[in-house]
Amino acid sequence: MRDLTEIRQQIDQIDQKMLALFKERMGCSVEVAEYKRGTGKAIYDPVRERQKIDALTKDEDELIIKKSVEEMFLQMMSISRRYQYS
């Protein structure tokens, strides 16, 4: 069994990577908003969001993971929309 400190250090490293990826994703979100504004498309696209969630969860058998991934990405998409509207 690994030491708790070692496990927490690994989690901290993963969190830093996730933060960097989130910032990168938000940068892409700005580009999406610019494109949508330039082409007259709506910021909110519920069909696209549902397709994205379905694609991310389709191969996951464990229900708690599937629901957690869905919740996490729905929240990220909500944050992304707010970012795009600003």
Describe these PLM feature segments:
Residues 1-86:
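Domain-level signature for soluble enzymes in the chorismate/prephenate branch of the shikimate pathway
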